Amino acid sequence: MKKLINNPNDVVVEALLGVEAAHPDLQVDHANKIVYRGDAPKPGKVGIISGGGSGHEPLHGGFVGLGMLDAACAGEVFTSPVPDQMLAATKLVKDGYGQLRAAA
């Protein structure tokens, strides 16, 4: 299998740049490595946040969008997102209707 990786140390950052370029309806918080809906938070909707280790794309960030996740945290390669990332995602999609979070 051929892999298109410029530098292993930059793979997560470059993947997020690719998501941002390919999906204008999504936003990326580059400081926290979070992909989230551009229209978040949605009034009257429970926020749904997921996250997990990078390296299995399009898993988690690939499921952000209408009828799916509101935000996804990209951990480092094969590493779960850190609590600060999940907290930052919580603040991005918070609307007072509660949230569901799942991280792997």
Where are the regions a protein language model picked out?
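N-terminal amphipathic/basic leader segments beginning at the initiator methionine
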Residues: 1-47
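Conserved active-site and cofactor/substrate-binding residues in soluble primary-metabolism enzymes
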Residues: 7-14, 43, 55, 59, ...
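Glycine-rich, flexible N-terminal cofactor/catalytic loop recognition
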Residues: 34-66, 73
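Short glycine-rich or small-residue beta-strand-to-loop segments that form or flank ligand, phosphate
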Residues: 2, 46-53, 69-76, 94, ...
